[in-house]
């Protein structure tokens, strides 16, 4: 009985190990924004010694990296200029994983208290210079609603 159990358990572990797939951190996923005109760090995990190929929809350049003994891998990819065109990144270790609907651009994080409640037009004695022209021109830019 024990011999059958251990044989079955060993088979199950070998089978599960053979099905390793690129794992990515939660910060990398569909619908993300990547920094424009830079080198973006991409990383993840896979079976130790596995070659992971990375391809981006905005470039013909292919990247290849081999996982370390701990299964970790990392690569830097060149990113395009800002655009509203959806992009994708494909990771391939023999089983493809693709991240879709990625935009290249800037993400600004603003924090504050009372200074964060100022309207675009400013306050009574503190107007924002040129705000009305900026608001009118905003509609000419794709993606500004």
Task: Locate predicted features.
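Exposed boundary/loop context
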Residues: 5, 10-13, 37, 64, ...
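Secondary-structure boundary elements
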Residues: 114, 118-145
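Intrinsically disordered, low-complexity boundary segments flanking structured domains
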Residues: 9-13, 96-97, 129-136
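Non-catalytic, glycine-rich low-complexity segments
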Residues: 19-48, 102-110
């Amino acid at each position: 009985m024990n011999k059958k159990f251990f044989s079955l358990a060993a088979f199950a572990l070998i089978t599960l190990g053979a099905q390793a797939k690129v794992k990515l951190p939660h910060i990398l996923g569909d619908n993300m924004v990547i920094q424009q005109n830079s080198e973006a760090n991409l990383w993840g995990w896979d079976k130790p010694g596995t070659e992971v190929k990375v391809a981006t929809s905005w470039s013909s350049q292919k990247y290849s990296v081999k996982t370390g003994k701990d299964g970790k891998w990392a690569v830097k990819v060149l990113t395009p200029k800002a655009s509203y065109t959806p992009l994708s990144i494909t990771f391939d270790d023999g089983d493809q994983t693709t991240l879709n609907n990625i935009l290249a651009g800037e993400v600004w994080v603003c924090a504050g208290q009372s200074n964060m409640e100022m309207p675009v037009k400013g306050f009574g004695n503190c107007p924002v210079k040129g705000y009305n022209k900026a608001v009118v021109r905003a509609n000419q830019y794709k993606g500004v609603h």
